[in-house]
Curated annotation (Swiss-Prot):
One of its GO terms (cellular component) is plasma membrane. This is Coiled-coil domain-containing protein 81. It comes from the Eukaryota. The keyword Zinc-finger does not apply. InterPro entries: CCDC81_HU_dom_2 (IPR040673), Coiled-coil_dom_cont_p_81 (IPR026295), HU-CCDC81 (IPR028034). The gene is CCDC81. Residues 238-256 have a biased composition (Basic and acidic residues). Keywords: Coiled coil, Cytoplasm, Cytoskeleton, Phosphoprotein. Residues 238-258 are annotated as: Disordered. Residues 436-493 form a coiled coil. It is found in: Cytoplasm, Cytoskeleton, Microtubule organizing center, Centrosome. The keyword 4Fe-4S does not apply. The modification Phosphoserine is found at residues 206, 275, 296, 417. It comes from Homo sapiens.
Length: 652
């Protein structure tokens, strides 16, 4: 969006920025102060704020180790610039991963407009057009410092984005002070904390400070030209622009004068000596304004000497431009001498230049020491490498000269040992014989041990074979006995043999004793059938009982479900009726309130200007500084000690 607007600025010029030309620097600062207050209030509630086309204020959580495997969890505020702006201008910022449970709310222009005497369109236009100026300044590779009142300073230097928070703001966020201390002691966040002394410092001329925007270029220059930081002619154009804006204030469209009057009553103007002097000089010189900002540059010394105020000996009018000052305060304001900081600023610029030169010399010296150290290390490494190569070459040559090396020798004819070594030889021979005896004994013991182990293994194997043989015989005998018992049972239960054959017999041969067997068989079958019938009846009875129990359970479940459904329907109907009744009551209450408000608005519109207390107070003018009447010429509210009361002889 910003690049599209930046291109459109070249074609449309002043038409793209309709709001900023009608606002002064103080009004822009007031609007951005309200924006900063809204952001600070949301951050206090642990909510993030998203500024459209600029960035997001939110929190990140980090674990800081404190030793002994202990850590503390801190939640520190961060500013994340929008990715579109970063990509367009090629900026660099630290990658920050924010937790998803922190809510992010957009910038509410309505709430900001309610905090000041500006409507929503003016606030939104001021914010957006200020961000356009910021984008243009970044595109021209200028150093920018964007101040958020009560929060911190956003610094953009050398295409690097850094948000530095005030120490008081961090203490407000944390409460215990551990957050500011932890950020100041960590290497990555040591430059994220801005002390109160650094916050009151003056910006160098190469840094463009926001949100105090110089609108001097919009009248006579193209919108995309560079911002000139010198004072000179640009200061005069700024004065002309302020005069034009003062003239346009009379023709500005105001939707609700009484609402604006109420807002002004809620936010009274803070009048200082400098602002009073500016308005007095405006009425005297016909529109030329003197501000302390125009006196803060070294190149403005000549203009400062020419533009010093001329004080008048007496008071001409007490109500110039709505000042409402008494004679004493007006004379004091006219005799105030402005402070000129040109020499101090020139000294500060010179100190900064010397500090930069000293820092550059230190950096060059450190770089030279590093280079010398690297060169010495390189030379030492070269010497070590050459020495190692020489040693390796010498070892290789030595090996090539003596390729074979014998460690033992064979003598054909060994000379006899001298007589002095005879005792040693005997001792050696005795020790050798002893060693041989010990070795033979060990061999004999080992052989005997092996023979013993072999015999034990043979005995164990013989016992195992005997046990297996006994078990086999036992199993065989048991199997034989089993077969024998089976044959005996078969012989015992063997059916009767066929009757002997008798030729030409008149009596029946088969079926003589079958009647008893048939009767017994029938009885047995009857008993079987009776038992089966009883079992079937019992099974059928159990099935019927289970079915009845299931039906009863289902019926109870259906009844309970029906009762619950009816209860839910009743509760839902009651809730709907209650909601409808509440909505109806709210509607009636809202209608009554709207009717009452309309009546009050109509009565307010019909009322005259002299009916209200604040309007009546306008008849009694008071000095804005000492709160005395405007006709005051030096009287005191204190009762004098030597006051003589008329009609009394007492001297108080």
């Amino acid at each position: 969006m910003l690049d599209t607007i930046a291109r459109a600025l070249q074609d449309l010029g002043r038409q793209v920025l309709p709001t900023l030309p009608s606002l002064s620097q103080e009004e822009v600062s007031i609007i951005w102060g309200n924006v900063s207050e809204f952001v600070r209030r949301q951050l206090t509630l642990h909510k993030g704020v998203q500024i459209p086309a600029f960035g997001t204020f939110t929190f990140i959580r980090q674990k800081l180790e404190v030793g002994n495997n202990k850590f503390i969890l801190i939640q520190r505020p961060v500013f994340i610039m929008v990715e579109k702006l970063v990509q367009i201008h090629g900026l660099k910022q630290n990658k920050v991963y924010t937790p998803g449970e922190i809510p992010i709310v957009p910038l509410n222009f309505v709430m900001i407009s309610l905090e000041g005497p500006f409507n929503r369109d003016v606030v939104e236009g001021c914010v957006k057009e200020t961000l356009l100026f910021l984008s243009r300044s970044i595109s021209m590779k200028q150093n920018v410092e964007f101040t958020f009142k009560g929060i911190g300073v956003l610094m953009i230097r050398d295409s690097k984005v850094k948000m530095r928070f005030y120490k008081d703001f961090l203490c407000t966020m944390d409460g215990s002070g551990a957050l500011a201390k932890a950020l100041a002691n960590r290497p990555g966040t040591v430059d994220s904390v801005l002390s109160s002394r650094e916050a009151l410092r003056k910006w160098p001329s190469s840094v463009l400070a926001f949100p105090r925007i110089e609108l001097k270029e919009m009248e006579n220059k193209l919108p995309m030209e560079t911002l000139v930081e010198e004072c000179g002619e640009n200061r005069e154009r700024k004065c002309k622009l302020k005069d034009q804006s003062d003239k346009e204030e009379g023709t500005r469209d105001i939707s609700s004068p009484k609402r604006l009057r109420d807002r002004q009553a809620l936010f009274p103007a803070k009048v200082t000596n400098v602002s009073l002097l500016e308005k007095f000089e405006r009425s005297e010189s016909g529109g030329k304004i003197m501000t302390p900002e125009s006196l803060s540059y070294p190149s403005c010394l000549k203009h400062d000497s020419e533009m010093k105020p001329q004080t008048s000996p007496a008071c001409q009018d007490h109500n110039k431009a709505g000042q409402e000052m008494c004679y004493v305060c007006l004379q004091r304001a006219q005799r105030n001498s402005l402070l000129y900081y040109s020499e101090e600023r020139r000294r500060e610029i010179e100190d900064e230049r010397l500090i930069q030169q000293y820092q550059m010399l230190k950096d060059q010296e450190a770089l030279f020491r590093h280079q010398m150290k690297s060169l010495a290390t390189r030379e030492q490494n070269q010497k070590n490498a050459a020495y190692n190569l020489g040693v390796a070459e010498a070892i290789r040559n030595h090996k090539n000269e003596k390729p074979e090396f014998y460690k033992s020798f064979l003598f054909d004819k060994r000379p006899l040992s001298p007589a002095l070594n005879a005792l040693k030889q005997e001792e050696y021979s005795r020790s050798l014989l002893k060693q041989m005896d010990n070795r033979q004994e060990n061999e004999i013991k080992q052989r005997q041990y092996r023979e013993l182990m072999d015999r034990l293994e043979q005995v164990q194997l013989t016992e195992e074979l005997a046990a297996q043989r006994a078990k086999f015989l036992k199993d065989k005998m048991e199997e034989t006995q089993c077969y024998k018992r089976a044959l005996d049972a078969q012989i015992k239960n063997k059916p009767s043999r066929l009757p002997p054959f008798e030729p030409d017999s008149s009596e029946p041969i088969f079926g003589k004793n079958e009647g008893e067997l048939m009767v017994e068989k029938q009885k047995r079958e009857q008993n079987y059938m009776k038992h089966q019938l009883e079992a079937a009846a019992n099974h059928k009875r159990k099935a019927i009982l289970h079915q009845l129990v299931d039906q009863r359970r289902d019926l109870q479940m259906l009844q309970r479900t029906q009762r619950e459904h009816l209860a839910d329907r009743t509760a839902e109907l009651e809730r709907v009726n209650r909601v409808n009744q509440c909505l109806q009551e709210d509607w009636e209450r809202s209608a009554a309130m709207k009717k009452q408000r309309d009546l009050e608005d109509k009565a307010f519109e019909r009322a005259s200007d002299k009916l209200f207390l604040l309007d009546q107070c306008e008849k009694y003018r008071r000095c804005k500084q000492c709160q005395r009447r405007t006709s005051n010429v030096g009287e005191s509210n204190l009762w004098p000690l030597n006051k003589f009361l008329p009609g009394s002889r007492l001297l108080v």
